[in-house]
Regions:
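Catalytic phosphate/metal-binding cores of nucleic-acid and nucleotide-processing enzymes, i.e., regions
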Residues: 1-85
Length: 85
């Protein structure tokens, strides 16, 4: 059965295989991602993320990373990227 779970965003998160990252967002000052998962899936993988602030340089692109979302945190904006496995 498919279900959407919320995970607190970190540099690395353990997710069920074949899961789909739907959205990133802020709740009460904490960064989260919402992920569509098969709750019967037992195999997992490590999903890795990069969190880049507006105006900060980085050296990756769409070939190695997938853009997820931008999060607004008061005067800061954070851009969330998933590292492709």
């Amino acid at each position: 059965m498919k279900v959407i779970y919320k995970y607190e965003l970190a540099r690395t998160i353990t997710l069920p295989i074949n899961s789909q990252i739907l959205k990133a967002g802020m709740q009460n000052g904490i960064m989260y991602i919402w992920v569509l998962v098969d709750e019967n899936e037992k195999q997992t993988y490590y999903a890795n993320f990069e969190i880049i602030g507006t105006g900060h340089s980085f050296e990756f692109d769409y070939l190695t990373h997938t853009y997820i979302d931008s999060l607004f945190d008061g005067p800061f904006v954070w851009h969330i990227w998933n590292v492709k496995n």
